[in-house]
UniProtKB/Swiss-Prot annotation:
Chain intervals for the UniProt region annotation (Disordered): 344-366
Organism: Pyrococcus woesei
Gene3D superfamilies found in the cross-reference section: Tubulin/FtsZ, C-terminal domain, Tubulin/FtsZ, GTPase domain
Record flagged with keyword Cytoplasm: yes
Residues annotated as binding GTP: G45, A46, G47, C48, N49, G132, T133, G134, E163, R167, D210
Ranges of biased composition (kind: Acidic residues): 344-354
Keyword GTP-binding (UniProt): yes
Main location: cytoplasm
The name this protein goes by in its record: Cell division protein FtsZ 1
Length: 366
C-alpha cells in the first residue's frame, strides 16, 4: 500500500481538565483584590465604646481601630488595632476634656495613624463630641484619611444639654472642623433621643446613642461588604457621600400589615432626622428584614424619593436579617442637608473653643 493510500487516522488529544478548585481560587483572589477596604476608627471614650460594641456584634469586612489618649480605657477595648496617641503629651492619662490636647496628641502620633489608615478605600470615624480626645483628634484623623484619597465619613453624637455648656462649646468646635475635613459628617443629636424615649435612665440613654452609632456604621458597611438580597457598589456609596457636608440619619421599623410604608414614614419622621430634607442632595436607604418582598422595597424607595429633591441621588440595598422575623427596619441617611447644628460661616477653624463665636447648638425644647 502506497503512502497515498494509507488510511487517515485521527489523533485524539486528551482534553485538559482544569480543576474547579483552581478556578475558584483564582476568582477568590480577584474578589479579594477588588473588594472595598473599609476601616472603622473609634476615637476617644465614646468612639471606643462604639467600636467595642461593633466587635461584639460583628461587622463583616471592616477593620476596627480604637484610638485614645487614655491608656487604661484603651486596654479594655476590643479592636483589631489599638493606638495610644500623644504618649509624650498625655502620658496615657487622657485629654482632660480639652480638645486642644486631643488635637495635639493626634498630631504627635500622625505617622502611626497614617500607617494604620494605609490602604483603605473608605474610613468611618466615630466619636462623641464634647470631650477632649474625640473632639480634638477626630478632625485630625479625618484630615489624614481624606488627604490619602480615602472616602471619609464621620459619624458623631452631640452631647445632651444636661452635660453642660462646656461640652456644648467643645462640640461646636469639633463639629465645624469635622465638616471641613470629612466628606460627610452624620450628626446624631443626643437630646433628640429624649423625644424617642423620654423616660430612659441616663445610663441607658448613652447606650442607645452608642447603638445608633453602631447601626449607622454597620448598616452602611455591610451593604457593601456582606452578601445580601441587594448589595451596594462602593462607587454608589462614594457618589452619595463624597463632598456632601452634613448628613442626618433616621431609623424606623414596623411589623404591621403596612410595615414597609410605616417603617419608611417613621424613618423620615424620626426626631433624629432633625432637618428639612426637601433640598437634600443624596439619600442612602438600608432596608433589613427576614422576608422583605420586592414590592415592599419599592414602596420604601418611592416614599423616600418623593420627599427629597427630584435631582437627589438615591441608592438602596436590602440585607436579610432572620432575627427581625416579621419586622422591617429602614435606616435612611440623608446627605447634603442644611443643618441648624452648623452653618457655612462656622467652618473656619478656631484657635480655642473659648474663642468660638456665639453660635448655639440649638436643641428644641422637649
Amino acid at each position: 500500500m502506497s503512502l497515498e493510500e494509507s488510511p487517515k487516522r485521527k489523533i485524539r488529544c486528551p482534553e485538559v481538565q482544569v480543576p474547579q478548585s483552581n478556578i475558584d481560587e483564582e476568582l477568590e483572589k480577584i474578589v479579594e483584590q477588588i473588594k472595598a477596604r473599609i476601616y472603622v476608627v473609634g476615637v476617644g471614650g465614646a468612639g471606643c465604646n462604639t467600636v467595642n460594641r461593633m466587635m461584639e456584634v460583628g461587622v463583616t469586612g471592616a477593620k476596627i481601630i480604637a484610638v485614645n489618649t487614655d491608656a487604661q480605657d484603651l486596654l479594655k477595648v476590643k479592636a483589631h488595632q489599638k493606638i495610644l496617641i500623644g504618649k509624650e503629651l498625655t502620658r496615657g492619662l487622657g485629654a482632660g476634656n480639652d480638645p486642644k490636647i486631643g488635637e495635639e496628641a493626634a498630631k504627635e502620633s500622625e505617622r502611626e495613624l497614617r500607617d494604620a489608615l494605609e490602604g483603605a478605600d473608605m474610613v468611618f470615624i466615630t466619636c462623641g463630641l464634647g470631650g477632649g480626645t474625640g473632639t480634638g483628634a477626630a478632625p485630625v484623623i479625618a484630615e489624614i484619611a481624606r488627604k490619602m484619597g480615602e472616602l471619609t465619613v464621620s459619624v458623631v453624637t452631640l452631647p445632651f444639654t444636661m452635660e453642660g455648656i462646656r461640652r456644648a462649646k467643645n462640640a461646636e468646635y469639633g463639629l465645624k472642623r469635622l465638616v471641613k475635613y470629612s466628606d460627610t459628617v452624620i450628626v446624631i443629636p443626643n437630646d433628640k433621643l429624649l423625644e424617642v424615649a423620654p423616660k430612659l435612665p441616663i445610663q441607658m440613654a448613652f447606650k442607645v446613642a452608642d447603638e445608633i452609632l453602631v447601626q449607622a456604621v454597620k448598616g452602611i458597611t455591610e451593604l457593601i461588604t456582606k452578601p445580601g438580597l441587594v448589595n451596594l457598589d462602593f462607587n454608589d456609596v462614594r457618589a452619595v457621600m463624597k463632598d456632601r457636608g452634613v448628613a442626618m440619619i433616621g431609623i424606623g421599623e414596623s411589623d404591621s400589615e403596612k410595615r414597609a410604608l410605616e417603617a419608611a414614614e417613621q424613618a423620615l419622621n424620626s426626631p433624629l432626622l432633625d432637618v428639612d430634607i426637601s433640598g437634600a442632595s443624596g439619600a442612602l436607604i438600608h432596608i433589613s428584614g427576614a422576608d422583605v418582598k420586592l414590592e415592599e422595597a419599592q414602596q420604601i424607595i418611592e416614599y423616600v424619593t418623593r420627599n427629597v429633591d427630584s435631582k437627589a441621588q438615591v441608592i438602596w440595598g436590602i440585607q436579610l436579617e432572620p432575627e427581625l422575623e416579621k419586622t422591617i427596619r429602614v435606616m435612611v441617611v440623608i446627605t447634603g442637608v442644611t443643618s441648624r447644628y452648623i452653618t457655612p460661616e462656622e467652618e473656619t477653624p478656631l484657635e480655642t473653643p473659648e474663642e468660638s463665636p456665639s453660635i448655639e447648638i440649638s436643641i428644641p425644647e422637649l
